[in-house]
Amino acid sequence: MASNMKAVKLRIKSVQSTMQITKAMELVASSKLRKAKERAEVCRPYFTELHETLKDIARENTDFSSVYAKESPNNKTCYVVIAGDRGLAGGYNTNLFKCLEASAEGKDYMVLPVGKKAVEYLRQRGIEALTEQFAEVGNISVADCFEMANMLCTEFRKGTFGHIELCYTVFNSMLSQQPEVFSMLPMADIREESGGRIETKNLILYEPDGETVFDAIVPEYLAGLVYGGICESTASELAARRMAMDAATSNAEEMIDQLNLYYNRARQASITQEITEIVAGAEGL
């Protein structure tokens, strides 16, 4: 009985140590989440406006000869997949990869992975990667996003792939994060996603002409969408980690309560047994 009580006591200490770690991780995630949420909300209007501008130009110039605007005969797709660098974030990475698998089913595709978990996922499944130089999403800067955009534009013009899609996680709220696949190029894909109904926002005259402006801002457009996706995904990952660590802390507290109850019962049984033995010994005298 004594050895059993000792094992329970050690188990309680072990769970308490784990609970301290999960509580600390929850507090760190909460602290980082506030900044990430603010960054995502600040970035969103700019990238939304940039996307609307390209749709506006494309709608008014359906006879574009730009390779970025017309439908591509190349059916290969390049997915820009933004995952996390670490685990312990609930189903954040798993749900993202399920979304990718559903979108890529039956397609010829390759991936530009952003984040360590995305790189690991590709290696485990032998999926072709455009590059692995952006393996740490936590270290990605705006300059890196422009480098990614220029790389994507170069390979798109070369015909390496004919479609570019962004796979990331949308931050809806602290309790809701939704993985999503978003078509970036060619513009014909975006027009098709909208059911061919892209309404003109403003009557704007582009100089020297719409196509020149369009080609010039496409790399910035891609960089903007990638950076916006990173901001959204980072906020989503931190929110998912905070929820996971909060659940882990609650489970640890519940487990400690159960172990304490078991320990107290075992201790009470041990004391009762000792009293019984003393009484029996006294009666024998």
Identify the function of each model-found stretch.
Residues 1-285:
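C-terminal beta-strand-loop-alpha-helix "lid" module of Rossmann-like NAD(P)-dependent dehydrogenases
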